[in-house]
């Protein structure tokens, strides 16, 4: 699979970057529509977006570099080679929440309304961005037989044929799962849920899928013998459950009063 889409004056434009940009643009468009549901000033939301986007990318890269320090410590000049891949979703999500919280305070936005607004936008961008891994021939699973991979479209078969072997298209599994989560979040948006519930459900549903899919991958970021994505996913699942229970208990108490 050729990771380069085209060249402009000798500069390679890679599919990875194109798909990341596409995900960001579509997520921004969805945020515009959802800002009306939550009565959020879109100019203020754009201010949050302008700050959170670069900070999230920085955190996504930093997270990836830290857990691949054996390589980047020996090749520090490669730390900036983002267009070749190497953005960790969990790092980006953590960066987005931190910067989003700080900006919500600065622009006087309700933080829970903000994260409920953007939760489906996150998962939409993730679903699209995963295809960048496909073109980079990364984030795939272990070796599978031709009988297994033959159930997939031909272009997936070709893309997952690497160095003489076929591999699990884990990027595809996660992209499909993310689309399912997106549909769920959009369907429950207008339900009478406590503030923050959409985001908490995003944490739970996304992390459930990521936990199981990560177990198939061969290039997981590791901390000793632990797959970091699975550890963080478990933390997010537990945190999401606690927060959604707490917020709905608080919501019922407020309603009774």
UniProtKB/Swiss-Prot annotation:
Q: Name one GO cellular component term.
A: plasma membrane
Q: Kindly report, in one word, the top-level EC class recorded for this enzyme.
A: transferase
Mark the transmembrane ranges: 8-28, 48-68, 84-104, 109-129, 169-189, 196-216, 225-245
Its BP terms in the Gene Ontology are: lipoprotein biosynthetic process
Question: Per its record, what are the GO molecular function terms?
Answer: phosphatidylglycerol-prolipoprotein diacylglyceryl transferase activity
This enzyme's EC code(s): 2.5.1.145
Q: Where does a 1,2-diacyl-sn-glycero-3-phospho-(1'-sn-glycerol) bind?
A: 130
Q: In which pathway does it act?
A: Protein modification; lipoprotein biosynthesis (diacylglyceryl transfer)
UniProt-listed PANTHER family: PHOSPHATIDYLGLYCEROL--PROLIPOPROTEIN DIACYLGLYCERYL TRANSFERASE, PROLIPOPROTEIN DIACYLGLYCERYL TRANSFERASE
Superkingdom, natural source: Bacteria
* Places the protein is found: Cell membrane
- Protein name (record): Phosphatidylglycerol--prolipoprotein diacylglyceryl transferase
Q: Which cysteines are joined by disulfide bonds?
A: none
Name the family the entry cites: Belongs to the Lgt family.
């Amino acid at each position: 699979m050729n990771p380069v889409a085209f060249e402009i004056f000798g500069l390679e434009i890679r599919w990875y970057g194109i798909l990341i940009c596409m995900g960001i643009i579509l997520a921004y468009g969805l945020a515009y529509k959802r800002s009306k549901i939550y009565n959020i000033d879109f100019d203020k939301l754009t201010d949050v977006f302008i700050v959170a986007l670069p900070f999230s990318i920085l955190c996504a890269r930093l997270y990836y570099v830290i857990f691949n320090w054996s390589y980047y410590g020996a090749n520090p000049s490669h730390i900036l080679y983002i267009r070749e891949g190497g953005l960790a979703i969990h790092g980006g999500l953590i960066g987005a929440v931190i910067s989003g919280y700080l900006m919500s305070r600065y622009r006087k936005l309700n933080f829970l309304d903000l994260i409920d607004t953007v939760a489906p936008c996150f998962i939409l961008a993730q679903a699209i961005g995963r295809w960048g891994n496909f073109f980079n021939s990364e984030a795939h699973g272990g070796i599978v037989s031709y009988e297994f991979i033959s159930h997939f479209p031909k272009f997936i078969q070709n893309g997952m044929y690497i160095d003489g072997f076929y591999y699990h298209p884990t990027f595809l599994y996660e992209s499909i799962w993310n689309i399912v989560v997106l549909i769920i979040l959009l369907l429950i948006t207008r339900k009478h849920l406590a503030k923050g519930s959409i985001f908490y459900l995003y944490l739970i549903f996304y992390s459930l899928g990521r936990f199981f899919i990560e177990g198939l991958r061969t290039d997981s970021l590791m901390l000793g013998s632990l797959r970091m994505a699975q550890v963080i996913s478990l933390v997010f699942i537990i945190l999401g459950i606690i927060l959604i229970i707490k917020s709905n208990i608080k919501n019922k108490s407020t309603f009774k009063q």
